[in-house]
Amino acid sequence: MPIPVHALAHSPLTIDALDEFLALPTAPHVLDDSEALDLEVRKRGWAWEDLVQDSFRTGHGHVLCTDGLTPFGVPDARSFLVFGEVYPVDPEDEEMDNGTWLYGVVDDWQKLPGWSGRRPCTDQDCEAVLEQAARTMTDRLGRGPERTVPSSAAIATGPALTHRVWRTPTHALVLGPASDNGPYGYLTHLQLSCTPLSCAPDLPPADDTDGLERWINAHVDW
């Protein structure tokens, strides 16, 4: 049975956007001073973005966050490409209000270039966004995900959505929901993370649900 969601804003993950994102760790290194970063941001057609603190809006309209000062040419940085924002329903809210002022935050995401939205919607609409992104990943990498597992409440608020895991020789690529880590902590990103494999031990087997949850959390939580 579909699970209700207050609102969803999203922008399709394309091959070009994915290519640019996956190339960041091996791109020419850009110094982490403001002048050098501003120059690289302008050269790429990016902009600084306030929806997530210290983030960028790429030329494809997605929001890119990193745990370092620069995402350019830093192989050990963890980077996150946000292509969807979910405002989940809180089933514990007896009046089902859930802080309706958060609609305005989702509106800001929906106003980004190339983004669209739906309200109300369901977890199935969110899964459709993730499935489209997964097809792009499969087309780009030439193979499907190594692991597919439902998300847990420890990783993201809202209904359980699908996490998919790929690996390159150096990085883990995790596609799925993640906490927005914003000032309210209630919205959920739909994102692709690119993080060094060293963030967690070897990928657990498919039947080790608890181990996979810990492994994914080590890569997507920041």
Where are these regions (language model features)?
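Active-site beta-strand termini and strand-to-loop segments that position acidic
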Residues: 165-170
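Short, isolated positions in well-ordered beta-strands
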Residues: 173-174
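Short helix/turn-capping signatures at newly exposed starts of structured segments
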Residues: 1-151, 156-159, 179-222
